[in-house]
């Protein structure tokens, strides 16, 4: 089904698609409550679906059952007025009126509307404290993520992780990793050996909705990298990452 005022979860297809995007436009700012209510009313008239606000201004969400797993759901994210959507389970983004996929440049520019709302300190930092030039949607239980992150660690690469999993069974462990005293080291152990930390205390402030929304904006495929110049790559090779980060360093581009 296409997205013509109808929304459907599409199963994830292949990885390894490399896309380049343009400079960000139309940066989003915080939405007052009245604006959120008006946006939601507009979307509910368009789609006859129940929408809720997300942690990102101007971006709203519905949940749909995952095909062949009716007790699990995946978020579908829709911009105000229904112009564009991110369908978690489908790589990339779509036009809201036709369901046609956005080009790489359109998708990336759409993500970067919210670059100022990304809580960078809440991401899992790896490779020191230098300029941040790459964000990586990664899953500690994903073989592709494990292989890539091992190579990045060996090279001393500086990047920040949006933590995720490849299924729902391991999602309860994400707060344990994030709330551990050293989340960077805990993540490395989890992805490298499968070792998990003790359960997080009830005071843990892990923001599940925030991370799931951010994951959905990246398309849901793990690993996916977003570079500070707007290049977005699914399943990037270590060689590409090294070359891209060197270019960004020479050009002085960072988040």
Regions found by a protein language model. Name each.
Residues 4, 22-27:
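Serine/threonine-rich, low-complexity intrinsically disordered segments
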Residues 173-190:
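Acidic, Ser/Thr-rich peripheral helices and adjacent loops at domain boundaries
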Residues 10-20:
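Bacterial N-terminal signal peptides
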Residues 16-18, 26-136, 141-172, 189-222, ...:
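Extracytoplasmic thiol/disulfide redox context detector
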Residues 1-12:
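Bacterial N-terminal signal peptides that target proteins for export
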